[in-house]
Amino acid sequence: MIVKRPVSASLARAFFYIVLLSILSTGIALLTLASSLRDAEAINIAGSLRMQSYRLGYDLQSGSPQLNAHRQLFQQALHSPVLTNLNVWYVPEAVKTRYAHLNANWLEMNNRLSKGDLPWYQANINNYVNQIDLFVLALQHYAERKMLLVVAISLAGGIGIFTLVFFTLRRIRHQVVAPLNQLVTASQRIEHGQFDSPPLDTNLPNELGLLAKTFNQMSSELHKLYRSLEASVEEKTRDLHEAKRRLEVLYQCSQALNTSQIDVHCFRHILQIVRDNEAAEYLELNVGENWRISEGQPNPELPMQILPVTMQETVYGELHWQNSHVSSSEPLLNSVSSMLGRGLYFNQAQKHFQQLLLMEERATIARELHDSLAQVLSYLRIQLTLLKRSIPEDNATAQSIMADFSQALNDAYRQLRELLTTFRLTLQQADLPSALREMLDTLQNQTSAKLTLDCRLPTLALDAQMQVHLLQIIREAVLNAMKHANASEIAVSCVTAPDGNHTVYIRDNGIGIGEPKEPEGHYGLNIMRERAERLGGTLTFSQPSGGGTLVSISFRSAEGEESQLM
């Protein structure tokens, strides 16, 4: 927009006219006053001509020797500069005419005075004095008119200045003050968030019109921006409320994991918290192939979302979920899946720690047995050897008793060594499949038979105590097959039934066994049965139709009801 009449130019023009009018009126008045400075002198000199005229008549009548001197004085007074300067263009004609008549008549009178013509002088002196009076009167009127002119010019200048000031102020009021007041009012309304003020007048041809147009555009843009910011603030507020709700959910989930023992109940509680707060239709945590817990019922009309449950790049399982608002639930469930991964990691860490405690305790027992019972058995073997040497060989009864005693002592020593080996079992893995693989790899070095493993038993179904008992049963069964079955292949398989029952099979392709009976003084099978009872299960021996031996351990974990397939 082009500014046609800028405020600065309009104000400058108005002030210029005011100053110009002031200068003109003041200048004319000053010039007029300057020209009046010697008016009084001119009037005085003109008035003195009357007295000098009478004095010349007296000198002429009395024959005074000063007549010529007085004539010269009159001549000087009549032609004084203050009177001769009256012959200018701005002096009224009446003044100049009167002055010209005085000069002309003075020539005649001066001539008569030089001739001494007293009668003529006396006859014309009064007329000449009257002319002087008229000249003085003309000078007086001229001076008065100049004063009136000064007054008139000053009055006209004052009226002109007042008029210019009035119109300037009026214009400033309409074109500057009023628009500025509107701008102030509109600014105050905008300050209070009110953008519905009437549009400002944009028709003004000055900067304020341009400012009003720009302000209207700014107000419109601010209105749009303000509404946009309000919408953004509302959105951010909703996001903050949503984030707060999610943090509360995550806090509740973290509190569910903040227990001394992380088990399946903790994971189910987490799924319940998420389902209650996120309104998810279905949640399912899968760990391995045979262990999962779920909340809700799956909806076939909704897609199943899957998130990996990981910790330190290790995948522990998957989190399946269904929700009608996938985008809003996904960030929370990502965090929940990470939390479940940490929970599974700490579950295995706790189990590993408990296993280490058990292993340390069993190693301590093994050391105590070795330091006590093993030393006693060794001492008995030495004493038995000495006793054999002291008994005659022809004493058959004593020799038979000594042979039985020696056999029993050897069996006790062998069983003690096996027991010490069992107590010194060390495993570095916390989850059941890895622990079984580690144990079988160790046994594989002791046999030519092929050891295979198929473990589908969920590690979360067992705590550390149960897992150690199960490992010991499997180890004892595999060792028995290695020693007595003459087998070329020994297979270990672990499965979980849909009802939550777990079964471990140790099968070999060896010679098979009949009724499982232990020789007198052997307790391996009894120990295996006792361990199975501690698992809350049963130990059975059978001969499959294909030959060999099948050892079965069936049990139900403490959380068996939680690990059913749902």
Swiss-Prot record:
UniProt-listed GO biological process terms: cellular response to nitrate; cellular response to nitrite; nitrate assimilation; signal transduction
Reactions performed catalytically: ATP + protein L-histidine = ADP + protein N-phospho-L-histidine
Pfam families according to UniProt: HAMP, HATPase_c, HisKA_3, PilJ
Subcellular location: Cell inner membrane
Residues the record lists as Phosphohistidine modifications: 370
Periplasmic side: 35-146
Molecular-function GO term, any one: protein dimerization activity
All residue ranges annotated as the Histidine kinase domain in the record: 364-559
InterPro entries in the cross-refs: HAMP_dom (IPR003660), HATPase_C_sf (IPR036890), His_kinase_dom (IPR005467), NarX-like_N (IPR029095), NarX-like_N_sf (IPR042295), Sensor_HK_TwoCompSys (IPR050482), Sig_transdc_His_kin_NarX/NarQ (IPR016380), Sig_transdc_His_kin_sub3_dim/P (IPR011712)
Function: Acts as a sensor for nitrate/nitrite and transduces signal of nitrate/nitrite availability to the NarL/NarP proteins. NarQ probably activates NarL and NarP by phosphorylation. NarQ probably negatively regulates the NarL protein by dephosphorylation.
Name of the protein described by the UniProt record: Nitrate/nitrite sensor protein NarQ
Protein's organism: Escherichia coli (strain K12)
